[in-house]
Amino acid sequence: MTTASSKVAIKPLEDRIVVQPLDAEQTTASGLVIPDTAKEKPQEGVVLAVGPGRFENGERLPLDVKTGDVVLYSKYGGTEVKYNGEEYLVLSARDVLAIIEK
């Protein structure tokens, strides 16, 4: 398991990852402020910790994502967790749809 300079003390198991969702847009292109109640849940976040991978046929399968990656994930995937005042998402690696290269 790797963590982003120990930012989070959550150690994911098997093929799970810990993601910190990125903030959704606060305003529209025309400058209108979007209230919290109307915002879509973010589907983009930074990977903070990665589990060791799951076992298949006695071998551990490595994950495609690594700490620091910015990923797109399934809208309803994962479990929201609040730890030390911060909100995180614990996802199965299967819920990651893509890695965003910036």
UniProtKB/Swiss-Prot annotation:
- Gene3D superfamilies documented for this protein: GroES chaperonin
Q: What is the source species? A: Streptomyces albus G
GO BP terms:
chaperone cofactor-dependent protein refolding
Task: Locate the coiled-coil region(s) and give their ranges.
Answer: none
Keyword list (alphabetical) reads:
Chaperone, Cytoplasm
Q: Where in the cell is it found?
A: Cytoplasm
Q: What is this protein called?
A: Co-chaperonin GroES
Is ATP-binding set as a keyword in this record?
no
Recall the GO molecular function terms of this protein's record.
ATP binding; metal ion binding; protein folding chaperone; protein-folding chaperone binding; unfolded protein binding
Self-association and partners: Heptamer of 7 subunits arranged in a ring. Interacts with the chaperonin GroEL.
Q: Which InterPro entries match?
A: Chaperonin_GroES (IPR020818), Chaperonin_GroES_sf (IPR037124), Chaprnonin_Cpn10_CS (IPR018369), GroES-like_sf (IPR011032)
Q: Which function does this protein serve?
A: Together with the chaperonin GroEL, plays an essential role in assisting protein folding. The GroEL-GroES system forms a nano-cage that allows encapsulation of the non-native substrate proteins and provides a physical environment optimized to promote and accelerate protein folding. GroES binds to the apical surface of the GroEL ring, thereby capping the opening of the GroEL channel.
Q: What Pfam families does the record point to? A: Cpn10
Q: Which NCBIfam families match?
A: PRK00364.1-6, PRK00364.2-2, PRK00364.2-4, PRK00364.2-5
Which superkingdom?
Bacteria
Gene Ontology annotations for the cellular component aspect, listed alphabetically: cytoplasm
What gene does the UniProt entry assign to this protein? groES
Family in the record: Belongs to the GroES chaperonin family.
